């Protein structure tokens, strides 16, 4: 079965932060962690060290913050969709992003929605629909109109598990390669008599 994203999830664009920004830190009554474009990686992870502090002049609405179960996308290509897990909630979402919240009876799990949005074919479809824009921006309407395959829940869960295991393996391989590089440098330095002797 094929379903439109608009039938499966509510989509809300992030907030234009310049309207709520404190003129200086002394006027700042509220501080929030906020998403940045570089905080998202191609695997759907959010890098905490790339989040920024936003100083607001007033309290901001809860609807503009991440919640567990949200799928957040960048509104520039590539979208790098991310599933919000525990520990990543209450992060301010600026206007360069959109939040997708699965509707209660939609028959889709949020992790599967993220997985569908992360597919190369979806990214290519979005790029072809947004071809007139020079900066490769993604309109919320384009996302709402996307059609994705809606599999039975057990298939969705299996696909999510396969993706999760694959991403864990990739992370372990990267760590192994880095450790191998460090070991090789150390051994070569020892063999040729490096400066640290």
PLM region spans:
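Glycine- and charge-enriched low-complexity intrinsically disordered segments
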Residues: 109-132
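A short glycine-rich beta-alpha junction/loop motif
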Residues: 91-97, 132-158
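A short beta-sheet element
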Residues: 75-115
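Generic structural signal for buried aliphatic residues
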Residues: 70-73
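A structural connector/turn signal
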Residues: 60-61, 87, 133
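Sequence-specific dsDNA recognition surfaces
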Residues: 6-23, 40-68
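Short, surface-exposed loop/turn microsegments at beta-strand edges and helix-strand junctions
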Residues: 24-32, 52, 64-66, 84-96
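Non-catalytic DNA-recognition/assembly elements of restriction-modification systems
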Residues: 1-26, 150-197
């Amino acid at each position: 079965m094929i379903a439109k994203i608009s039938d499966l999830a509510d989509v809300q664009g992030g907030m234009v932060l310049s309207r709520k920004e404190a003129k200086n830190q002394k006027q700042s009554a509220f501080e929030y962690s906020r998403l940045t474009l570089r905080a998202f990686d191609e695997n759907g992870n959010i890098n905490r060290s790339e989040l920024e502090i936003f100083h607001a002049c007033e309290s901001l609405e809860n609807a503009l913050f991440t919640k567990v179960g949200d799928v957040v996308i960048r509104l520039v290509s590539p979208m790098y969709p991310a599933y919000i897990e525990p520990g990543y909630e209450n992060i301010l979402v600026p206007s360069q992003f959109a939040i997708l919240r699965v509707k209660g009876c939609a028959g889709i799990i949020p992790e599967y929605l993220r997985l569908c949005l992360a597919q190369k074919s979806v990214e290519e479809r979005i790029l072809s629909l947004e071809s007139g824009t020079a900066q490769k921006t993604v309109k919320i309407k384009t996302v709402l109109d996307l059609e994705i395959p809606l599999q039975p829940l057990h298939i969705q869960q299996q696909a999510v598990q396969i993706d999760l295991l694959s991403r864990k393996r990739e992370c372990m391989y990267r760590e192994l390669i880095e450790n191998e590089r460090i070991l090789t440098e150390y051994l070569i330095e020892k063999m040729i008599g490096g400066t640290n002797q």
